[in-house]
């Protein structure tokens, strides 16, 4: 989606602003070289979508069409007011594509009613323009089909070849163009696409609600739009806070967000989210992945290792196309970017991490080759299947498959005395204060909803996206966080692929959250001494351990196996570093509080929130650990 907070620019503005900044020296290039036209394109049900077309003045050769469909506005509006830059990068703008921007149904200047991630119909349905069995005529696939059909028939000087791209929410609309695609649609690039909002994107991760992001985002995105408008203004309510942790702690149970002064039941999408506390038909209908089969356009999936919103969407969209359309020309590129960071001109560092290069230079070469090959067309783009930036070494790697087949599983087991069984490349680990008594086969901590573990150290007024790489020493010092680590590695260890924790947990309550963090611990000497660099983290709401559709209470005192997949990494743990796993049961206010009782969290009362003693088991009967895909 999708994020708006008090510290960073809204993602919906990043591509335009970044391109504007890098094109400041080009003056009026767009106005001097393009004609602008604003039209309403009719859809099959009579609804008209507002569309802006920038066509090259040069008519000596036909030009391809590259389009973005967006809920964030296709402005600036007005025939005489031009964008300062066009398309996904400067090179393509200078190659004189026809660039098209469209307000999706029900947003800004388009007609119709907006739906959150419009559910896809059963394809094929586009060419015959007939309703499906339910009588429904349209979805985002049909709107893309009708738009493309109009463009190739009506825009003078086009070469009959169309591409679609989009970042974040526009990435969803790019993905939605793939089922039963128009024959003129030759390539699509879903970039950080919103894909499945219950399992891993934006709204929820494994059933746990991402409170901080959605509270801020829905506050502006949920503003009603009864008629077409050129500008949305304001918010549903005013919430000006300097300390997000304290603000949401004071807010109390999740249902209080609908109190007067906040959403007050005026947020349509917020209320839909609150009604969908399990993987109901609402969420399933908005999962685009089952529809990504028989894909005909070539695809370039783009994502960032530090994307706090939709990393899941990038990785799982690529995976869905590979599994359901194995012969499609499908590519993926993953770099050290935050959400949409590849759209700018310069990306050399993030937080304290210095990449030693502008990684966007490589990406823009890949992106340009992809579009030129399928839309001009040119000779083979020569793109590898997977182009992956390896953190730790700061190197681009290419693979024939993703994840690479060369990776082999290595399971690291939790041990007494805060130990993590060491790979062969690690020396034995001696804990700072070895226990002298026999291990009971578990470690335990008290999880208190009144004092949850913060997702990041310090005071922050909004979600700080650097939490995804931040130093975890602040958490390791807490009594409600358990940390396990190897000894120093005697050689580099490269982990490339998907992580799978398998943790045996028991509680005195009847529900719990489990947050698993994989951490690269730097040596005590050298640069960033002792830095506990977060490599990957994920939350799992334990009542969904057997089913997202039918949650089950935990039985107090009885160990339950919590096994799930985390997003991939491509990271080299360097010689002399340690591998650490941290476990905890809150991640606040990034994730809403689990009452630790088996209740419907969106309607839970303050009395439902209880302290619980969490035990992490690691005996022979309960071998807790995490499996890493290691490159040989």
Task: Identify the residue ranges that each predicted region occupies.
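N-terminal cap/lid segment of alpha/beta-hydrolase-fold proteins
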Residues: 25-59, 485, 489-491
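Cap/lid segment of the alpha/beta-hydrolase catalytic domain
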Residues: 60-153, 343-355, 478, 510, ...
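Accessory cap/linker subdomain of secreted extracellular hydrolases
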Residues: 82-85, 94, 116-130, 134-137, ...
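Alpha/beta-hydrolase fold nucleophile elbow
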Residues: 156-168
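Glycine-rich nucleophile elbow surrounding the catalytic serine of serine-hydrolase chemistry
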Residues: 166-176
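C-terminal, loop-rich substrate-recognition/catalytic regions characterized by aromatic stacking residues
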Residues: 239, 246-255, 349-632
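Short beta-strand/loop motif that positions the catalytic acidic residue
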Residues: 295, 301-303
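Active-site-adjacent alpha-helix of alpha/beta-hydrolase-fold enzymes
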Residues: 312-330
């Amino acid at each position: 989606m999708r994020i708006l907070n008090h510290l960073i620019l809204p993602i919906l503005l990043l591509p335009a602003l970044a391109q504007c900044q890098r094109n400041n020296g080009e003056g009026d290039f767009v106005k001097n070289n393009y004609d602008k036209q604003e039209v309403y394109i009719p859809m099959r049900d009579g609804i008209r979508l507002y569309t802006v077309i920038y066509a090259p003045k040069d008519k000596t050769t036909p030009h391809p069409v590259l389009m973005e469909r967006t809920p964030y506005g296709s402005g600036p509006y007005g025939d005489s007011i031009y964008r300062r830059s066009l398309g996904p990068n400067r090179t393509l703008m200078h190659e004189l594509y026809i660039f098209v921007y469209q307000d999706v149904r029900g947003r800004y200047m388009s007609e119709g009613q907006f739906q959150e991630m419009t559910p896809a119909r059963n394809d094929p349905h586009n060419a015959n323009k007939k309703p499906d069995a339910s009588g429904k005529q349209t979805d985002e696939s049909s709107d893309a089909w009708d738009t493309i059909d109009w463009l190739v028939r009506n825009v003078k000087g086009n070469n009959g070849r169309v591409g679609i791209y989009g970042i974040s929410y526009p990435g969803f609309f790019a993905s939605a163009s793939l089922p039963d695609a128009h024959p003129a649609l030759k390539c699509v690039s879903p970039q950080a696409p919103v894909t499945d909002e219950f399992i891993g994107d934006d709204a929820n991760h494994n059933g746990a609600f991402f409170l901080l992001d959605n509270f801020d985002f829905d506050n502006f995105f949920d503003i009603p739009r009864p008629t077409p408008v050129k500008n949305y203004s304001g918010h549903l309510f005013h919430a000006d806070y300097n300390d997000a942790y304290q603000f949401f702690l004071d807010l109390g149970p999740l249902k209080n967000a609908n109190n007067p002064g906040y959403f007050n039941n005026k947020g349509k999408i917020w209320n839909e989210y609150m009604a969908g506390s399990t993987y109901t038909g609402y969420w399933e209908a908005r999962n685009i992945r089952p529809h990504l089969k028989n894909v005909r356009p070539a695809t370039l999936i783009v994502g960032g290792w530090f994307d706090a919103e939709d990393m899941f969407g990038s990785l799982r969209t690529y995976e869905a196309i590979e599994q359901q359309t194995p012969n499609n020309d499908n590519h993926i590129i993953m770099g050290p970017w935050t959400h949409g960071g590849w759209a700018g001109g310069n990306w050399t560092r993030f937080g304290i991490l210095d990449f030693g290069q502008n990684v966007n230079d490589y990406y823009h070469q890949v992106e340009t080759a992809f579009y030129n090959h399928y839309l001009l067309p040119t000779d083979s783009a020569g793109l590898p299947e997977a182009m992956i930036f390896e953190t730790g070494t700061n190197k681009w790697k290419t693979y024939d498959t993703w994840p690479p087949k060369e990776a082999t599983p290595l399971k690291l087991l939790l041990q007494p005395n805060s130990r993590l069984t060491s790979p062969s490349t690690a020396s034995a680990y001696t804990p700072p204060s070895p226990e002298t008594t026999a291990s009971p086969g578990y470690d335990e901590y008290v999880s208190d909803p009144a004092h949850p573990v913060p997702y990041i150290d310090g005071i922050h007024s909004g979600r700080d996206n650097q939490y995804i790489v931040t130093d975890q020493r602040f958490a390791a010092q807490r009594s409600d966080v358990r940390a396990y680590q190897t000894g120093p590695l005697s050689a580099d260890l490269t982990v490339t692929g998907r992580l799978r924790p398998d943790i045996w947990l028991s509680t005195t309550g009847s529900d719990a959250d489990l947050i698993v963090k994989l951490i690269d611990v730097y040596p005590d000497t050298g640069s960033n001494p002792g830095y506990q660099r977060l490599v990957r983290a994920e939350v799992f709401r334990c009542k969904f351990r057997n089913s997202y559709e039918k949650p089950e209470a935990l039985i107090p005192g009885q160990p339950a196996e919590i096994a799930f997949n985390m997003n991939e990494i491509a990271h080299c743990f360097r010689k002399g570093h340690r591998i650490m796993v941290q476990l905890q049961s809150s991640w606040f206010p990034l994730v809403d509080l689990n009452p630790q009782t088996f209740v419907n969290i969106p309607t839970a009362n303050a009395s439902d929130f209880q302290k619980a003693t969490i035990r992490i088991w690691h005996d022979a009967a309960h071998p807790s650990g995490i499996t890493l895909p290691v490159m040989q």
